[in-house]
Amino acid sequence: MTDDRIIGAGATREDDAADASIRPKRLADYLGQVPVREQMEIYIQAAKGRGDALDHVLIFGPPGLGKTTLSHVIANELGVALRVTSGPVIEKAGDLAALLTNLQPHDVLFIDEIHRLSPVVEEVLYPAMEDFQIDIMIGEGPAARSIKIDLPPFTLIGATTRAGLLTAPLRDRFGIVQRLEFYSVEELTRIVRRSAAILAIDCTADGAGEIARRARGTPRIANRLLRRVRDYAQVKAGGHIDEAVAQAAMKMLKVDPEGFDELDRRLLKTMVDYFDGGPVGIESLAAALSEERGTLEDVVEPYLIQQGFLVRTARGRMATHKAYRHMGLKPKNPPQDLFAEVPDVG
């Protein structure tokens, strides 16, 4: 289920083009994710000092936090080439073999959405990661034979938003595992100011902070909002972005200070107005909103739950007191015992 809202974390074609121009090249320019940055700096320096390829790296976390950017930074720090592909693109074992045999010593192969590799392709990847060798079948039928091809030492970087879907044998072959966390408002403010400087956008610190507060902890959303606020400022404010201009632009975009858009607010309002705050089943909620169940489960709910506006219980979804306060309402009922027995209504 894709999320094409302005506050959606999924990448659009415009995001990909814009990211290329503002993507940091070095760890020193990679803002946020301090523990990850410090660890990778040590691992990279150690590998370069030994003259070895860096251990294979698994990067996981929600979309839009910089997994692809970090892979580019790692390759730049190592001073090697980066080959980019994704799990769904590698359909056959031969596709992977072609990628691996074209690598130079110590090159980095980046596989996005690595959890979507087929089992057949994974089987080829195991000896490549462990022994830098692949087995290829030549011919068909009785004449078929297996040949072993040696590979140069390389680093595989796998990225995924769903680490739980990785098979255990694949996960265990990564020597370095990094989880990317959501960014603080302060970190996002620095990212917005850096992007504004690169794109020659006149943006004050307060204006950047106003954008960062609505970015849902995600740099991709922050940069997308910056581009839309730039458009507004260009037409309405002579190209200058300050706090007031950013607020006016966000009002036009219907993105509130919590980073909620119209669909987020409509879900909470429907739960409160029509279902007394819950608990309510997902099918009933989807019908009331005229939205698909998958859209609510995969696109809308995760951020509301993460921010404490919504909880999932065995009996259904419930709006929290924080949700009532956000809508300017007084909670109608005291918090319910989420573990209470459901009465038997026969």
From Swiss-Prot:
Q: Which GO terms describe its cellular component?
A: cytoplasm; Holliday junction resolvase complex
Looking up InterPro entries in the UniProt record yields: AAA+_ATPase (IPR003593), AAA_lid_4 (IPR041445), DNA_helicase_Holl-junc_RuvB (IPR004605), P-loop_NTPase (IPR027417), RuvB-like_N (IPR008824), RuvB_C (IPR008823), WH-like_DNA-bd_sf (IPR036388), WH_DNA-bd_sf (IPR036390)
Region ranges (Head domain (RuvB-H)): 257-346
Membrane spanning stretches: none
Record text about domains: Has 3 domains, the large (RuvB-L) and small ATPase (RuvB-S) domains and the C-terminal head (RuvB-H) domain. The head domain binds DNA, while the ATPase domains jointly bind ATP, ADP or are empty depending on the state of the subunit in the translocation cycle. During a single DNA translocation step the structure of each domain remains the same, but their relative positions change.
Q: Matching HAMAP family, A to Z? A: DNA_HJ_migration_RuvB
Q: What does this protein do?
A: The RuvA-RuvB-RuvC complex processes Holliday junction (HJ) DNA during genetic recombination and DNA repair, while the RuvA-RuvB complex plays an important role in the rescue of blocked DNA replication forks via replication fork reversal (RFR). RuvA specifically binds to HJ cruciform DNA, conferring on it an open structure. The RuvB hexamer acts as an ATP-dependent pump, pulling dsDNA into and through the RuvAB complex. RuvB forms 2 homohexamers on either side of HJ DNA bound by 1 or 2 RuvA tetramers; 4 subunits per hexamer contact DNA at a time.
Name by which UniProt lists this protein: Holliday junction branch migration complex subunit RuvB
